[in-house]
């Protein structure tokens, strides 16, 4: 515990007094202080001026990070026949129909992304209470209900990130690993911020992006200059 305490104190000292940084400055600081034995995820949290209780203020979308997430994504696909074969050939980890539904209902959710062909939605719909809270429910708005199964699986495996404003208007995601080069992390952060900016809903009032914080899995967070991050 003493070693952990020392590391934590050092990180806090490094972050003390620092705020409203550029993306480059924030990435450098977070990366330099991600010193645990495992490869920490660099995470972004954005506080948005929206009330997700209103349909016209929902923020949801998908973005392909230029340098991937560094995470191995496990993809499940609901499909039958040729589309099931297509999913397997594209690299899907789990492919099924009613059998997959029963597995999930039994409590086994061993995947990070769920894709379905449109004809499978009556089956998938029964899993709304299970997949919905985990943000795993296939949705045509983010390309996970589609006949182009191959493209959807490849996108998920290639670093595509889904985002959705949660209660309080917070959007968060992993944008890479601490082992990534700074330049690659900067590119990923820019891509994510840009995607959320473009997803501004019609019902949003006042300031849309209120706060952006960058951190690593075990490290403290640092705030970014919102105006600068959006304009980059």
From Swiss-Prot:
Pfam families: Ribosomal_L1. It comes from the Bacteria. One of its GO terms (biological process) is translation. Keywords: Repressor, Ribonucleoprotein, Ribosomal protein, RNA-binding, rRNA-binding, Translation regulation, tRNA-binding. GO terms for molecular function: rRNA binding; structural constituent of ribosome; tRNA binding. InterPro entries: Ribosom_uL1_bac-type, Ribosomal_uL1, Ribosomal_uL1-like, Ribosomal_uL1/biogenesis, Ribosomal_uL1_3-a/b-sand, Ribosomal_uL1_CS. GO terms for cellular component: cytosolic large ribosomal subunit. The keyword Repressor applies. Part of the 50S ribosomal subunit. HAMAP family: Ribosomal_uL1_B. NCBIfam families: rplA_bact. Belongs to the universal ribosomal protein uL1 family. Binds directly to 23S rRNA. The L1 stalk is quite mobile in the ribosome, and is involved in E site tRNA release. Protein L1 is also a translational repressor protein, it controls the translation of the L11 operon by binding to its mRNA. This is Large ribosomal subunit protein uL1. It comes from Ruegeria sp. (strain TM1040).
